[in-house]
A protein has these predicted regions:
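Intrinsically disordered, low-complexity regulatory segments
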Residues: 1-171
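Single conserved hydrophobic/aromatic residue that forms the stacking wall/gate
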Residues: 172-181
């Protein structure tokens, strides 16, 4: 069985893989020593724009307000689709027993990982790597002290809430400003 490690950036994934002994390069990930190590390339998926909810919202109109999605939708950047597909395949592999969230230690890293995890339809156990240094010893120490992913549920919810608030504010203010010009 494998443990799948998902980092936020390819460079971080390569550093982690080197310490873990996952040196075999594959398409979109590294493998070896019981580990699969991949990456998100930053925000692979983001909240969809208003037109995804209703084509009428493509043009800002005061009459349409407020736009408050009941179920939020996400889009995947076309230039990042291949990497998302790789992650989804890895997350769904039957020989993957656990997923390690190795995205950046913080609110955005938590959001990036959890969004991909959810969109992939994964329900495997999550552990959290929380490190602030890419020194080999710090990486080893971090993997020795992995924490259950559920301990970061609040951080994820805070990040998701902030992201939705940003979406609402950006939609209302930027489109209104464009419309006034």
């Amino acid at each position: 069985m494998y443990q799948l490690v998902i980092a936020e950036k390819p460079s971080v994934a390569q550093g982690l893989a080197a310490v873990l002994g996952a040196g075999q390069r594959r398409e979109g990930y590294l493998e070896g020593n019981g580990w699969l190590v991949s990456w998100c390339v930053g925000h692979l998926a983001e909240l969809a724009d208003a037109a995804a909810y209703d084509p009428a919202y493509a043009k800002w109109r005061k009459e349409d307000l407020p736009i408050l999605p009941e179920h939020w939708k996400f889009t995947i950047s076309p230039d990042k689709r291949d990497q998302f597909d790789t992650l989804r395949t890895l997350l769904r592999r039957e020989d993957v027993a656990e997923v390690v969230n190795a995205c950046d230690a913080g609110r955005e890293g938590e959001l990036i990982f959890r969004t991909v995890y959810a969109l992939a339809g994964c329900s495997k156990p999550i552990s959290r790597l929380w490190i602030s240094s890419m020194e080999d010893e710090a990486i080893r120490e971090g993997f020795t002290h992995l924490r259950p992913g559920r301990e970061y549920d609040g951080l994820h919810q805070a990040a998701l809430c902030r992201s939705k608030a940003d979406w609402l504010c950006l939609f209302y203010t930027s489109d209104a400003a464009d419309d006034m010009q």
